[in-house]
Amino acid sequence: MKLHELKPSEGSRKTRNRVGRGIGSGNGKTAGKGHKGQNARSGGGVRPGFEGGQMPLFQRLPKRGFTNINRKEYAVVNLDKLNGFAEGTEVTPELLLETGVISKLNAGVKILGNGKLEKKLTVKANKFSASAKEAVEAAGGTAEVI
C-alpha cells in the first residue's frame, strides 16, 4: 500500500450531481429549473419575503417596541465562580477582569446568587441580587456596593 493507492471506502463518497450536462444524466435540458418563468432565467428569482406583489407578512404586521439608548448591561458573575479565590480575598471588578472571570466590564459587575459560596470574601461590585448578598454575608464575608 502506497500513498497514491489510497482510495475512499466504497459508498463513503457520493459524486456531485452536475446539472445541465445532457439528457442521459436525468438532469439535462432545463437543469431542474422547469420551463420558462422568472426562476428559469439567469439571475432570476425573487427576494426573501416576496409574495408575488401581495403586501408581505412582515409589512402587514405592526412594528413593536424600541431600543433603550440608556440601557445598562452589567457583566454577570455567579457565586460559584467566586470560589476560585483564596479565603479573605477582596474581590473587585478589576480583579475579576484580570483573572478572566469576566471578559469586559460593560456598565459594571452584578453578582447573582447561582451556586454556593464556601469562602469568606470581601466582594465589591456595582450591583448584587438579594440572594447573592445574603449568601456572601452568610459565608462570613461582606458585600459592598461601589
UniProtKB/Swiss-Prot annotation:
It comes from the Bacteria. Keywords: Ribonucleoprotein, Ribosomal protein, RNA-binding, rRNA-binding. Residues 21-31, 42-52 have a biased composition (Gly residues). Disulfide bonds: none annotated. One of its GO terms (cellular component) is cytosolic large ribosomal subunit. InterPro entries: Ribosomal_uL15, Ribosomal_uL15/eL18, Ribosomal_uL15/eL18_sf, Ribosomal_uL15_bac-type, Ribosomal_uL15_CS. Belongs to the universal ribosomal protein uL15 family. This is Large ribosomal subunit protein uL15. The lineage of its organism: Bacteria, Bacillati, Bacillota, Bacilli, Bacillales.
